[in-house]
């Protein structure tokens, strides 16, 4: 059928991918489409494996178009020094912050990353900023990012500078992390109910949460051989 690509035919696939690159270049540079520039950067990264060109397009799309997804991707490049960029956590933090605040497909991931970098302290002269970390973990947790919910539970479980210990909030965020599939969220909530640690003791809930943690752990082990580490 006309228009369909035979993906078993190497020449057809090559022509298709070349045309795709041309189309995305036109969208980006001629039509000035921010989404087109983001697609072009992804094309260079995923198809051509040309990370330097991808980084260049991402910078253009951030500087000229303030594209949320490109800010997220550029931030990830700065974290690892990808595409010939220097490892620069402050630049990464700035990119993630802009992506988080602008909204978009990767904004929740970006909010979580802002929390991680603020918590780490290396973007603030080696001084951890627990309050900023909490605020951005909250944004990500509100968007159902399980790891941020768990990090909030750990923060309230232990307390931090500017954040008093709060066992009720620790339990709330542990249970939310658990509901989103975070094994340790389930395990921590189970332990709190089992020991009556700052909350009313409840053996039934403790057992239920422990079983969910076990089930999630088993599911993760079954999936692990098929998962490769991404960015």
From Swiss-Prot:
Q: Which UniProt keywords apply?
A: Mitochondrion, Repeat
The primary site where this protein sits is mitochondrion
Pfam families for the chain: Sel1
Entry-linked SMART domains: SEL1
- One GO cellular component from the entry? mitochondrial intermembrane space
Where does each Sel1-like repeat begin and end? 34-66, 68-104, 108-145, 146-182, 183-218
Q: Which domain of life is it from?
A: Eukaryota
Location comes to: Mitochondrion intermembrane space
* Coiled-coil annotated residue ranges, if any: none
Q: Which SUPFAM superfamilies match?
A: HCP-like (SSF81901)
Is Repeat given among the entry's keywords? yes
According to its UniProt entry, the function of this protein is described as: May be required for assembly of mitochondrial respiratory chain complexes.
- Family assignment from sequence similarity: Belongs to the hcp beta-lactamase family.
Put simply, this protein is called: Cytochrome c oxidase assembly factor 7A
Q: Which organism is it from?
A: Xenopus laevis
């Amino acid at each position: 059928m006309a228009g369909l690509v035979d993906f078993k035919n190497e020449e057809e696939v090559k022509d298709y991918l070349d045309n795709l690159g041309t189309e995305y270049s036109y969208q980006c540079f001629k039509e000035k489409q921010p989404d087109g520039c983001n697609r072009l950067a992804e094309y260079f990264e995923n198809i051509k494996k040309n990370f330097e060109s991808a980084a260049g397009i991402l910078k253009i799309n951030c500087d000229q178009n303030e594209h949320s997804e490109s800010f997220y991707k550029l931030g990830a490049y700065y974290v690892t020094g990808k595409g010939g960029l220097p490892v620069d956590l402050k630049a990464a933090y700035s990119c993630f912050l802009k992506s988080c605040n602008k909204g978009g497909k990767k904004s929740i991931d970006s909010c979580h990353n802002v929390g991680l970098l603020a918590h780490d302290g290396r973007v603030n002269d080696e001084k951890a900023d627990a309050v900023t970390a909490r605020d951005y973990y909250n944004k990500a947790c509100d968007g159902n990012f399980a790891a941020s919910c768990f990090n909030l539970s750990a923060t309230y479980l232990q307390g931090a500078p500017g954040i008093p210990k709060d066992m009720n909030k620790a339990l709330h965020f542990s249970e939310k992390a658990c509901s989103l599939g975070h094994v340790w969220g389930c395990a921590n909530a189970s332990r709190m109910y089992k020991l009556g640690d700052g909350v009313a003791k409840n053996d039934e809930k403790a057992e239920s949460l422990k079983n969910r943690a076990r089930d999630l752990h088993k599911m993760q082990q079954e999936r692990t051989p098929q998962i490769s580490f991404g960015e």
